[in-house]
Regions:
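Terminal targeting/low-complexity segments that flank the catalytic cores of oxidoreductases
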Residues: 1-102, 106-115, 137-145, 149, ...
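Alpha-helical transition-metal enzyme core signature, strongest for iron centers
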Residues: 90-94, 98, 121-136, 167-178, ...
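Soluble, non-transmembrane catalytic domains of enzymes that act on hydrophobic metabolites at membranes
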Residues: 189-199, 207-228, 269-272, 308
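Active-site-proximal alpha-helical scaffolds that flank and shape metal-associated catalytic sites
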Residues: 134-203, 230-240
Length: 308
């Protein structure tokens, strides 16, 4: 590679790292730090009375007038249903992600470390999806599918997305939930099973985030200009979908609350706005650095409520 080539493979964060070296390190980490949730977690242990299923500060209605009128029992029940809804959302995201990864490696050498790591990540995501499904079933809560319009938008996105668009969406689906889960697994107020699920997910998702970030940096340097611009717009629209889908309104109905009133209070809540923006900040700072948050795309991100 000439000096001119090296200069091309730079962005605002510096020189891009070698794709194969990154994948080899991630493969080594996967070999040492991967988990089988079926054997790692105690699925038969009863839930502990009085413990939350999600930290109360992360429950959507926290610190709203409706929250202050709710009993502690109803608040905990809402945390259980919101945890189930987020697990359902996580399964939806991971099924999309697995298809995007398969598309990404379709034309690449199967013997490369980059492809082998993508296949390893798909293995991880299969386990995570099964783990989330088992958590939902264990709690006797319903599965909370996304709205049909979002289901269809996801189907369209995973079909037409550019490679940089795919990795931007991957990071959006992973990093906000990851931020919340990092607050959840050490929290002793939370049910041990939920803490165990989030611990496994955080450890394994850290590798997925590294892989996606490094590949997105490369793509935003090497992709055609039209692809970069298309990525900016589609990522902004996906952020809008994500922000809406993050709350499934049926959780309120299922715990005896007025759905419309609850959604209105969540939308007006400064605390909830701060939680979502804090959860997305590490990602939005990164996307800003690599020139994803530009033009129309940036305005869409801001309208999603994830960008201050």
């Amino acid at each position: 590679m000439t000096e001119a080539d090296i200069d091309v493979l730079r962005d605002a964060l510096g020189l891009l790292k070698d794709r194969e070296q990154i994948a080899e390190r991630l493969l080594a980490s996967s070999a040492k730090h991967s988990f089988d949730p079926d054997s790692e977690l105690d699925w038969d242990a009863p839930f502990e009375e009085g413990k939350w299923f999600w930290p109360p500060e992360l429950v959507s209605l926290y610190d709203t007038p409706m929250w202050r009128r709710m009993s502690e029992e109803q608040r905990i029940l809402l945390s259980q249903h919101e945890a189930a809804a987020l697990a359902s959302l996580g399964i939806w995201f991971e099924i999309i992600l697995m298809q995007l990864l398969v598309r990404h490696i379709y034309d690449k050498p199967a013997t490369s470390a980059h492809v082998r790591y993508a296949l390893t990540e798909i293995e991880d995501e299969c386990r995570h999806s099964k783990m989330f499904a088992r958590l939902i079933s264990r709690g006797d809560t319903p599965w909370y599918p996304v709205a049909r319009v979002h289901q269809n938008l996801g189907r369209l996105f995973k079909t037409i997305s550019t490679t940089p668009g795919s990795f931007t969406a991957t990071l959006l689906g992973e990093e906000v939930l990851d931020w919340m889960q990092r607050l959840t697994f050490p929290d002793e107020r939370v049910q041990p099973l939920v803490r165990g699920v989030t611990r496994i997910h955080v450890v394994e998702e850290a590798r997925h985030v590294r892989y996606a970030r490094e590949e997105l940096r490369r793509q935003m340097v090497t992709a055609p200009k039209w692809s970069q611009e298309f990525t900016r717009v589609t990522s902004g629209e996906f952020a809008r979908v994500f922000a809406i889908a993050f709350i499934n309104p049926e959780v309120y109905t299922n715990v005896g609350l007025d759905k419309r009133a609850a959604l209105a209070q969540v939308k007006a809540s400064p605390h909830r706005r701060e939680v979502m923006q804090n959860g997305a900040k590490r990602l939005t700072d990164f996307l800003d650095d690599i020139r994803v948050l530009r033009g129309v795309g940036r305005r869409l991100w801001r309208s999603s409520g994830l960008l201050a």
